[in-house]
C-alpha cells in the first residue's frame, strides 16, 4: 500500500464522527509494539513482511536494546471502509490516532498519560501467560478513565507451536482466559459498588464484561500478522449453514454444537451422548490449526494448495517453496485474516467517536475537577458536544511533555518533494544541460524550490538541543497557531482564578507521526496532537483554555511512587549549570521522576525502579544535560522503629523502659519523657489516614501551623474522617493494646502533635496538661510550660524525621510528656524568662536527646523498603528463581501454577536495597525464561537489633565474643551512616602489631 500523505490525515481531522483515538495497553512483552507494526504496515509506513520485527514506534536506542517500550508514542493512520448500503457502494475515510504505551511496571505513569488522551483501548493478553500483574494495572487505569476496552488475546500461535494443544483443549483454555479477565473487571465493579453503598446511585454492569459474541474480543497473532473477530467467521459461514449472521455469531462462542444432519444448533443438554465438537472448535480453531499443521509442524505442500484454493487467495510460488515457514504463514494470513483490518474495523465499530465519547464521559470528568459548579457552563456544553467551531471556547488537556531534538522539528527538516515536483526539477535540469547553462545555478533553483520555509534551517545545528513539546488532546473549539490561551497549573482552582494561571501564545502545532512531527496551522476538537511553546510554562501536565474560568483537568493520580534515589554531580564541576538545566528538562519530560536538592546541596533524582533510573541517567547524559555525570550508589529509604522484646520485658519488670528525665543546662526546668512503641494496627491506621491527620493537626494550637505534606498525599484517594470519627477509631485501637498504651485512650485530648512533618505515624502526648495552659500569673515575662510547647513539638518533629539509628524517618513510637516542671527556687530562675534566647535551643536539644535515649531503651529495629516481585517461570527454571530470591534476602510468599499452562507464578518480597541487578541475574540464571516485575510494596521490619552482641553462654560459645555471624541490620545502618557522614564506630587499623608482607 502506498504511503498516506500527511495532508490526507490533516484533512480528516475536521470530521469528528470518523476519528478514533485509542491506545494499546498490556503487560510487558505481550505484543503491543508488534501489533502496532502491523497497523503501520497497512498505511505503507513499513513493509508488511517486516511487521513484528521492526518495532517502528520503539525508536529510542535503549528501547531497541532492551526490546521493551519505555515511552508512549503516537502516530496517525488512515483507514478506508467500503460497505454496501441498498446496493450502493459507500466509502468512509477514518482517521486513527494510535498511542503505543509501555508495559513495564517502572513506566506505569506513561500508561496513565496515554489512557487519559484516548476514548478506547485495546488490552493485549498473552494467550499462554494469561493475566499478569501489569495486565490488572492497565485494566484498572482504563476503568478509572472510563474508556471503552477491547480485549485482544494475542500470541495464539503459541498454543499451537509451543503448548501443542489440540483445538478442543485450546477452546477450553481460551474460555478460562476470558473468565480470568472478566473476574478482574468484576473486582473493579464490586469495589465501586461498595464505595457507593451509601449513595442512591446505581451502576449498571451492562457492557463492562468481555464476550467474543458481542464483538469486544479479538483473537490474534501479531507476530504472524493475523487477527479475527467472530463476526468474520459468521459472515463466511452464514450462507453455507443457512443461519442468520447475528444468531451464528452468538453460537460461535461457548457450549454450542451443530447437528450435522439437521443443521440445528444444540446445547449440551440436547447432545444425548453424541460427541460433537463446539462450533468455535469446528468452524474456527480447526481451520487455524490446519494452516499451522500444513505450513509449520508437518509441512505438506498438497494440503497448502487445497487451503489456498478453499480460501480463494493468491500466494506466490516463492512463498510456498520458502524454507522459512513464516513467509508462507504471512502470505496466507495477510489475505485471509489480516490483522490490521480486524483491529481497525473493531476499533471503528466498538470505540466511540470523540463526539459520542465526550457526551458520555465529559460530565463525569468535569465533576471530579475542583469546584465543578463554578465552571463556565458554555465550556461544559462545548466539551460534551465536542464542538469544533471557532466561536466555542478552546479546552485542551496536556498529558505530558515530550522531548524532541530541534533538528527533528518540521522547520529544520527538508520538505519531501512530490512526484510532480521531482518531475519538474528533472525537466529543468535536462533543459539546462541541453542549453549549456551552468548546472550550479539550477541546483540553486532546486534548493530554493525545495521548501517554502527553509529560512532558519541554515542555522548552525552542531549545537543540537532538545525542545519540549506538549502531548495533548483538544476537547472543544479549534486551537490555532498564534492564539492566546490560559495555562492552568495542577493547583489551579476556580475559587482563586488569579493563582496558578498564565497566559501564553501558541507557537506551533504538530501532528505526531512517531518520531516525526508534521506542522499544523489549526487543530479542531476531538484530536490528539502536539503543541509547542510551553516549555517554560508547563511542568508535566496542564490545562489550556481560552477562558479564565475553565475546569482544571489535571486530576491524574500517580500509581507508581518513585522509591529509588540517586545523588548526581557533574564530572567537571564548572558544568553544574548544565546539570541543573538538564534536570529541569527531565523533570518536565518524565511524569514519574522527582527532582530534589538536599540540605547539603546535592541534586537527587527519584525514580520508580532500576530500569527507570537507567533511562533517566541516559537521557540526562545524551539529551538534556549533554555532559558527563557521576551518579552515586542508589539511596534507598529506610524507616526506624523500636519494639518490646520478651527478654527485654522480663529483665526490666520493675523498671519503666523508655522513661527519661532531663534538666535544661540553665537549670530550673525538668522534663520527664516516656517513649513507647506503637502496635502495627495503630501505625497502619495512622499511615492510612494521613489526610485526616493533616486536617486535625491544623487545630492543635491557637496558631494555624503550616502543615507540610507531600503532593502525593494530597492527591491520594484515601477516606477522610472527621476529627471525632478519627479519635473514636484511634481510641478503639489503643484500647486493644495490652501494654501501657491502653491507658492513653483516655488522654486523646492530650495529643499535641503527629510526626514527622506533622502527618506521620508517631504521636506526641502531653499527660501533664500544661502545654496548652496559657494562663499567666502576675509576672508576664516568667516562663510557663505553654511557652515551650512549640519547641517541644519542634524537637519531636526533628527526631522523628531523622531517627537515632541512621537519621532516617521514625515510624511507630508514642512520646508522652509525663513531667514538665519549672522551679521558682533555682538559683538561675532569673534566666527563665521568655526573652532568654538560649531557652529555645536548649529545650529542643534536651527533648531530642531524651527521646533518643527513650527510643534506644527498647529494642531498635530498621524497616526495609520492600518490592513485591512477580515472576512467571516454567518448572525447569523454578529452582533457579528460588535461588536468586534467597540470595537477595527475599522470601517467597506464594506460588501457584497457571491452569492449562506450564507456567508457575512466584510471588516474593525482596528488599529494595538488595534488588539492584536482580532482574539481570534472574534473566542470566534462567536463560531468559523468567522476567521479574518489581512493584513497591511498603516497609517491613527487619527483625534484628543492629546493636546486638553475644551475651549468654550459648551465644558466646556458638559465635564468640566478636559475633562471627554478620549482623545484617548493623551493616545496613553503618552503610547509611557512612553515606551521610555520621559517626561510625569502626577501627581503621586493626591488629597493627602484626607484620604484613606484600609481594610486588
UniProtKB/Swiss-Prot annotation:
Segment forming the signal sequence: none
Residue runs in coiled coils: none
Any matching Pfam family: EFL1
Name of the top EC class for this enzyme: hydrolase
Keyword Cytoplasm among UniProt keywords: yes
Keyword Nucleotide-binding: yes
Entries under InterPro entries matching the protein: EFG_II, EFG_III/V, EFG_V-like, EFL1, P-loop_NTPase, Ribosomal_Su5_D2-typ_SF, Ribsml_uS5_D2-typ_fold_subgr, Small_GTP-bd
GO molecular function: GTP binding; GTPase activity; ribosome binding
GO cellular component, one term: ribonucleoprotein complex
Catalysed reactions listed for this entry: GTP + H2O = GDP + phosphate + H(+)
Domain named tr-type G: residues: 17-246
Enzyme Commission (EC) number: 3.6.5.-
Regulation: GTPase activity is stimulated in the presence of 60S subunits.
Record GO biological process: cytosolic ribosome assembly; ribosome biogenesis
Keywords recorded for this protein, A-Z: Cytoplasm, GTP-binding, Hydrolase, Nucleotide-binding, Ribosome biogenesis
Subcellular location: Cytoplasm
Record-listed GTP binding positions: 26-33, 100-104, 154-157
UniProt record similarity statement: Belongs to the TRAFAC class translation factor GTPase superfamily. Classic translation factor GTPase family.
The protein's role, per its UniProt record: GTPase involved in the biogenesis of the 60S ribosomal subunit and translational activation of ribosomes. Together with sdo1, may trigger the GTP-dependent release of tif6 from 60S pre-ribosomes in the cytoplasm, thereby activating ribosomes for translation competence by allowing 80S ribosome assembly and facilitating tif6 recycling to the nucleus, where it is required for 60S rRNA processing and nuclear export. Inhibits GTPase activity of ribosome-bound EF-2.
The protein's name in its UniProt record: Ribosome assembly protein 1
Organism (species): Schizosaccharomyces pombe (strain 972 / ATCC 24843) (Fission yeast)
Species lineage: Eukaryota, Fungi, Dikarya, Ascomycota, Taphrinomycotina
